[in-house]
């Protein structure tokens, strides 16, 4: 049989979108999307905002990031007390919605993990609407990486966010 291929084997860690550009990484759960993104974070000089839907996913990202960047295996109960570094913020979509004013007009690499969860909530959630408005208003000063295991539900909304900017999307 064929061996399983991971996203980090396909996407080079230098394939980071530039300001005003975006990338959609759509692949199954367990294919290494987070590992690939962690490698990208380590290779970028841009400040990073990693956003996801749940505290559990956020804790797992922090744990994986600290292990990959510092070689430490941190117990979950200590994750909140350990800094990821001055150049990286890891928050939930709800936290981003409540604090978009802090990031308006600033240059960031935005990593939107489990983006299907945000966009599925878009019709009945004020915070999803607020984030979509933020993304549209800050296209030129941010680079965006969208991560999902279920692209069919989100591709039209991502296209709506991105295509007004006149930038082409790289779809993986």
Predicted regions and their residues:
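N-terminal helicase ATP-binding lobe
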Residues: 1-172
